[in-house]
Amino acid sequence: MSDYKSTLNLPETGFPMRGDLAKREPGMLARWTDDDLYGIIRAAKKGKKTFILHDGPPYANGSIHIGHSVNKILKDIIVKSKGLSGFDSPYVPGWDCHGLPIELKVEQEFGKPGEKFTAAEFRAKCREYAATQVDGQRKDFIRLGVLGDWSHPYLTMDFKTEANIIRALGRIIKNGHLHKGAKPVHWCVDCRSALAEAEVEYYDKTSPSIDVAFRAVDQDAVKAKFGLPGVSGPVSLVIWTTTPWTLPANRAISLAPDFDYALVQIDGQAVILAKDLVESVIQRIGAAEYTILGTVKGAELELLRFTHPFMGFDVPAILGDHVTLDAGTGAVHTAPGHGPDDYVIGQKYGLETANPVGPDGAYLPGTYPTLDGVNVFKANDIVIELLKEKGALLHVEKMQHSYPCCWRHKTPIIFRATPQWFVSMDKEGLRQQSLKEIKGVQWIPDWGQARIESMVANRPDWCISRQRTWGVPMSLFVHKETQELLPIERTLAAMEEVAKRVEVDGIQAWWDLDPKEILGEDADQYEKVPDTLDVWFDSGSTSYSVVDARPEFAGHAADMYLEGSDQHRGWFMSSLMISVAMKGKAPYRQVLTHGFTVDGQGRKMSKSIGNTVSPQDVMNKLGADILRLWVASTDYTGEMAVSDEILKRAADSYRRIRNTARFLLANLNGFNPATDMVKPEEMVVLDRWAVGCAKTAQQEILKAYEAYDFHEVVQRLMRFCSVEMGSFYLDIIKDRQYTAKADSVARRSCQTALYHIAEALVRWMAPIMSFTADEIWGYLPGEREKYVFTGEWYDGLFGLEENEEFNDAFWDDVRYIKDQVNKELENQKANGIKSNLEAKVTLKYADDANGTIKKLKLLGEEVRFIFITSQFVISEQAGGIDDENIQYNAGNTTVQAVVTRAEGDKCPRCWHYTTDVGKVAEHADICGRCVSNIAGNGEQRKFA
């Protein structure tokens, strides 16, 4: 027997079967860096329509975690897909560099400013620490395959950015949104600073729950309101609170105007309670008996006065919409200095915003003899004892409830009225304009709109001042005696002068500044405001300080902001507030949010549980492309589950895609698209169908990219590789590809299809599996740009026309019949027919309502190649077919596949069984088809 291996067109490629991504990717990254790939892309896209995804800056502290990876990969997928869609999509990564966490790190290592070194030296160390953190995170982000201007990122501590942050505040002041006030703010006694809403987390805390009686000043007046002048015993209004320590600051009791309030007789006294809460209160305080004497609406009790149990003054009953019947007594202890609702209602009634608590969380001198200097959380017991002594405590018990805590220290915080600077939500219509702007933004997922609308509608004024060392100074001057701001025009001019100096020397320029340098003779009357800006102001103003300022954005506003779903109350909110306050419009056109990562069981990632997944470990073991594929294949609109098992599944999917790409490349061996391409009208019909499949897939994939449905992209890509190609087309063409004459139309038609498919496939992959796409690109035949990322989606795809005889609908029917035939072939393995080529299939049919069988007959001898059998016979059964049949439902056609052993001998070259093996003397051991392909004109293929 002769060796015919050399006569076959066996697949050959240098593209490795194994990805070995962890080893190969770093080399590709080095090439990308050496070539300045990002710069090449920018040059290639110059002049195109822009799409700007503005990077929300991660905090420059610590190593990146899996959540960072999700965020950066999603951004990179969008930027790359937009580039392929014909946009110029520059990506400038950024970092948030000021603020408390960095201060704490520096304090831990060096101590607090003023202890061993000056505040200026402390700031320098903070800057140095932030820079090292940026460098560490940058390396990991680059390792993920994220393309961007990593050599020139934006940092909120860049001198130019710091200066622009000051200018942003100046614009907000000019537009009338800034005001100063003593207002309750979230206050962390450990930070010694006000906290933004985004810096507050909630944890369960056990607190004392108390019911306290405030005795009526004018007993007769209260009794008369209920129409009961003759009631015996004293009358009190009962409040309920879980913060006894705030009672020294009580200045009123709030009632709901429309609630019914009952005068209830218990144990020789009368108490006023919300009627709907009487039973629960009586049960709680343990009264043996009670009688409801009368009821009135809350509005009837307005401005009646009640005596504070121990502070020696009386307070009014006032009306507020914040009163509920969810718990308590229906009468709310109101301390305007210790709560936002209390403050708002206090302003309405002209109440004092009392704040008896210092920045360290201890009562100030003169508060109350037994409370002065005591920490408020330790004072609860003292207050309770005071109430007992005064006979005002009706009940006390412990209760667990959700309590605000500092995001950094995890310790309980307090509401504390302090002199702060605020961006007003309503003074100049910021709230209403923001709500209007929200409606013009596309929110992805769409529930994001309702979420941020609710937050904006209900949020208090934004406290933007902080009492910190490492931050952008507010750069304001106030009068030493009145604390009034420098007149507006002079304030704005002074801020611009400060900004110019900061642009040269950084924020330290403010602290080094002698006011005389700017204010001249008036310097003696004014002092510098020592406060720094909330870090959310830093990042929130980047639409102005970065997007408007960077030349690559060419004055265009950001198209998209993309962050985790917690940023509705964080960066999305602060960015919206600042942009609307400055310019009257939203800083973004689209806002996309992704969920948080959880483990395979849906649990939150936690070092204590030990269920965290390190992106560095994943990249070192599996490669960044596996991590990227996992991100893309997960529906980011909800929680994103990740575990070793889930990543293993991603690796399995990756292998299927890689194997498809390798098959394409290996079978393009020897193909030159410039000389070997077959015109569409001359191609084998099945090959045109395959290219059409790619065209349909591309339309769906591009639509999914456009909608940011990346898991749909992956699913469609997998279906194309595994189902349409892997289990149908690529199997069928192996015979033609390997055995036909190398330069025949039959084979070149096939290679033409593979070439078109590969050109499209590599681009579909590029935004997600960037390293692998770059690798594939290097093995594709033909002249091309150096990188796939500089081009656009492949536009060379075509397909079958609907009015053609052998159109897509026909091939859909064929695929269905083939699936049924394959099941019967599988069944026959038990009868000794081990491979499809050992089989002869007789396809019996009784009717042909949709004409599929008629068309199959027209394929003639080529039909067997579709079913990959040695013989294939189509037989009409006029009397119907056996009951044991395979039902094929399209057009009500019923078919039955009968499998028998193929006739003839096996050809050692093509492995088909045929009766003409050995008929040609010169090639006595191969079939006539193979003889023609070796020594003759070669077989002709029209259909398959």
From Swiss-Prot:
GO terms for molecular function: aminoacyl-tRNA deacylase activity; ATP binding; isoleucine-tRNA ligase activity; tRNA binding; zinc ion binding. It is an enzyme of class 6 (ligase). The keyword Isomerase does not apply. Keywords: Aminoacyl-tRNA synthetase, ATP-binding, Cytoplasm, Ligase, Metal-binding, Nucleotide-binding, Protein biosynthesis, Zinc. ATP binds at residue 607. Its main location: cytoplasm. A motif ('HIGH' region) lies at residues 58-68. Its cofactor is Zn(2+). Zn(2+) binds at residues 907, 910, 927, 930. L-isoleucyl-5'-AMP binds at residue 563. Its EC number is 6.1.1.5. A motif ('KMSKS' region) lies at residues 604-608. It is found in: Cytoplasm. InterPro entries: aa-tRNA-synth_I_CS (IPR001412), aa-tRNA-synth_Ia (IPR002300), Anticodon_Ile_BEm (IPR033708), Ile-tRNA-ligase (IPR002301), Ile-tRNA-ligase_type1 (IPR023585), Ile-tRNA_ligase (IPR050081), M/V/L/I-tRNA-synth_anticd-bd (IPR013155), Rossmann-like_a/b/a_fold (IPR014729). It holds the Pfam family zf-FPG_IleRS. Signal peptide: none annotated. It catalyses: tRNA(Ile) + L-isoleucine + ATP = L-isoleucyl-tRNA(Ile) + AMP + diphosphate. Binds 1 zinc ion per subunit. GO terms for biological process: isoleucyl-tRNA aminoacylation. Catalyzes the attachment of isoleucine to tRNA(Ile). As IleRS can inadvertently accommodate and process structurally similar amino acids such as valine, to avoid such errors it has two additional distinct tRNA(Ile)-dependent editing activities. One activity is designated as 'pretransfer' editing and involves the hydrolysis of activated Val-AMP. The other activity is designated 'posttransfer' editing and involves deacylation of mischarged Val-tRNA(Ile). IleRS has two distinct active sites: one for aminoacylation and one for editing. The misactivated valine is translocated from the active site to the editing site, which sterically excludes the correctly activated isoleucine. The single editing site contains two valyl binding pockets, one specific for each substrate (Val-AMP or Val-tRNA(Ile)). NCBIfam families: ileS. Belongs to the class-I aminoacyl-tRNA synthetase family. IleS type 1 subfamily. This is Isoleucine--tRNA ligase. It comes from Salmonella typhi.
